[in-house]
């Protein structure tokens, strides 16, 4: 059972409390993210929390790497903010979606930004990350 402090922890994506935001998609028995944007936000949160299993499970099999090695980034990369710039399609009724975002982080204490346009596919009621174009 989670403590009150854990239940009220802020979601890394900036969408409110973790439990009410991305936390509802991150567990092994959790519901799938209903939209491409919700999946993108939950994947950002998973990166921030070091949840490699979730990231791999939500990566489309056609482009999924074997591993991400997030443990190598632990203590070096700190994710500090997310801004969604644009969404195209990606609703519960769509089969494809695009989400453009800017993710801010610190790498070894130095501030950096990653501006990406990500492509998502929905198959069998689940959204998957397919690929991203970094600007």
UniProtKB/Swiss-Prot annotation:
Signal sequence bounds: none
InterPro entries, A to Z: NTF2-like_dom_sf, UPF0225, YchJ-like_M
Pfam families attached to this UniProt entry: YchJ_M-like
Family: Belongs to the UPF0225 family.
Protein name (record): UPF0225 protein CV_3559
The species this protein was found in: Chromobacterium violaceum (strain ATCC 12472 / DSM 30191 / JCM 1249 / CCUG 213 / NBRC 12614 / NCIMB 9131 / NCTC 9757 / MK)
């Amino acid at each position: 059972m989670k403590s009150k402090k854990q239940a009220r922890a802020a979601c890394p994506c900036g969408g409110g409390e973790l439990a009410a935001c991305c936390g509802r998609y991150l567990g092994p028995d959790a519901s799938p993210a209903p939209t491409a944007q919700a999946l993108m936000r939950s994947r950002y949160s998973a990166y921030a929390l070091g949840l490699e299993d979730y990231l791999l499970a939500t990566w489309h099999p056609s482009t999924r790497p074997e591993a991400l090695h997030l443990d190598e980034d632990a203590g070096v990369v700190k994710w500090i903010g997310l801004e969604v710039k644009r969404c195209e399609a990606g609703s519960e009724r769509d089969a494809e979606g695009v989400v453009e975002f800017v993710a801010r982080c610190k790498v070894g204490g130095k501030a950096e930004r990653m501006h990406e346009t990500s492509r998502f596919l929905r198959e069998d009621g689940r959204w998957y990350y397919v690929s991203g174009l970094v600007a």
